[in-house]
């Protein structure tokens, strides 16, 4: 319990201490055509998460796997993320650094995708040497999935907490207490940021954003834990379950990249076509969109947990995930129809209230 308290305190104090420093060095987010917030907001959520995570590691050092490699990796991501938040680094440079860290994870930590489980039938789909290449691309993909989903207040924090909670539950169920406690500690380290990001309890005056530094750190940590828990002998979680745990960020990223490429745009060019933007455009408030998307993510994670608990065939879980994926893509590509339907339902609800 002491390590959990120190984790929360370290993360919270970092937000307080770094706030004036961020304003002084220009580490702030300014409103533009994509960002509709009021005023400049400090981009210090990543530093807070790093310090909170570091506090937990220092207190539980002997219980955690490959601490030097993990802490080095997230420190590099934090530094590059802060530079990107301040100066806008090329996405190709960021992807290159992420690839190098993935290679170090494979080479020094022996952490990589060796198999995909029984997603195609009653046999294990082993990847062999191609799994090393897939691991690099998967690492870059997951990092950027959580980076891209960070578009409205609370969303990145909420979805991250859902993923870490699901992982923690499955690790606890399997008796992997070190991984379970770390997963729950990660939630604790996110909470101070999430509270201030949502204006709890100090109001919008003390709002902070996660920034690329934080979102990339979260994405790397999730792929790190998922690889540790889905690969190797006696793995406590099936690979297909990982898809359900990170379903919303992963599917949203793939759907958005597909839509951008289809329109002849760069897949790296930011826009306002993510699911949270479409929900706000349909008439929901940003808080309502945050709660709805987080709820859907929790439902997806629960499906993954239940699949593990009741030993549902992995191929059936994989088919279910693909159905979810195509429903999501259909909704994104037909967003104008859904937007019109939501607005019509809201008008009817208002008329019924008046009546």
From Swiss-Prot:
It comes from the Bacteria. The gene is wecA. It catalyses: di-trans,octa-cis-undecaprenyl phosphate + UDP-N-acetyl-alpha-D-glucosamine = N-acetyl-alpha-D-glucosaminyl-di-trans,octa-cis-undecaprenyl diphosphate + UMP. Keywords: Cell inner membrane, Cell membrane, Glycosyltransferase, Lipopolysaccharide biosynthesis, Magnesium, Manganese, Membrane, Transferase, Transmembrane, Transmembrane helix. The keyword Secreted does not apply. One of its GO terms (cellular component) is Gram-negative-bacterium-type cell wall. Pathway: Bacterial outer membrane biogenesis; LPS O-antigen biosynthesis. Signal peptide: none annotated. One of its GO terms (biological process) is O antigen biosynthetic process. Belongs to the glycosyltransferase 4 family. WecA subfamily. InterPro entries: ECA_WecA-rel (IPR012750), Glycosyl_transferase_4 (IPR000715), PNAcMuramoyl-5peptid_Trfase_CS (IPR018480). It is a multi-pass membrane protein. Catalyzes the transfer of the GlcNAc-1-phosphate moiety from UDP-GlcNAc onto the carrier lipid undecaprenyl phosphate (C55-P), yielding GlcNAc-pyrophosphoryl-undecaprenyl (GlcNAc-PP-C55). It is found in: Cell inner membrane. One of its GO terms (molecular function) is manganese ion binding. Pfam families: Glycos_transf_4. The chain crosses the membrane at residues 1-21, 39-59, 63-83, 123-143, 182-202, 208-228, 237-257, 315-335. This is Undecaprenyl-phosphate alpha-N-acetylglucosaminyl 1-phosphate transferase. Its cofactor is Mg(2+); Mn(2+). Its EC number is 2.7.8.33. NCBIfam families: ECA_wecA.
């Amino acid at each position: 319990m002491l390590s959990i308290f120190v984790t929360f305190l370290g993360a919270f104090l970092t937000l307080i201490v770094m706030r004036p420093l961020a304003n002084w060095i220009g580490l702030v987010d300014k409103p533009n055509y994509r960002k509709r917030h009021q005023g400049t907001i400090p981009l210090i959520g990543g530093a807070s998460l790093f310090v909170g995570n570091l506090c937990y590691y220092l207190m539980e050092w002997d219980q955690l796997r490959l601490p030097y490699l993990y802490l080095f990796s997230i420190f590099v991501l934090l530094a590059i993320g802060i530079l990107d938040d301040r100066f806008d680094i090329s996405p190709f440079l960021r992807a290159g650094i992420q690839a190098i860290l993935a290679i170090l994870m494979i080479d020094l930590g022996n952490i990589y995708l060796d198999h995909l489980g029984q997603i195609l039938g009653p046999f294990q789909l082993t990847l062999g040497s191609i799994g090393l290449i897939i691991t690099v691309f998967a690492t870059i993909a997951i990092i950027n999935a959580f980076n891209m989903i960070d578009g409205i207040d609370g969303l990145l924090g909420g979805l991250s907490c859902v993923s870490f909670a699901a992982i923690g539950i499955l690790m606890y169920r399997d008796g992997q207490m070190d991984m379970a406690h770390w997963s729950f500690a990660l939630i604790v380290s996110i909470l101070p940021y999430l509270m201030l990001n949502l204006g709890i309890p100090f109001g919008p005056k003390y709002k902070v954003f996660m920034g690329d530094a934080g979102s990339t750190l979260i994405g790397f940590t999730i792929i790190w834990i998922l690889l540790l828990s889905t690969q190797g002998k006696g793995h406590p979680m099936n690979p297909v379950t990982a898809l359900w745990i990170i379903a919303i960020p992963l599917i949203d990223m793939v759907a958005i990249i597909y839509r951008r490429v289809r329109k002849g745009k760069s897949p790296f060019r930011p826009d306002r076509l993510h699911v949270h933007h479409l929900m706000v455009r349909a008439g929901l408030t940003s808080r309502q969109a945050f709660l709805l998307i987080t709820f859907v993510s929790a439902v997806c994670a629960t499906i993954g947990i239940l699949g593990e608990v009741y030993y549902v065939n992995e191929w059936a879980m994989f088919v279910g995930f693909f159905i979810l994926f195509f429903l999501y893509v259909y909704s994104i590509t037909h967003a104008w129809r859904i937007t019109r339907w939501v607005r019509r339902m809201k008008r009817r609800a208002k008329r019924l209230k008046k009546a």
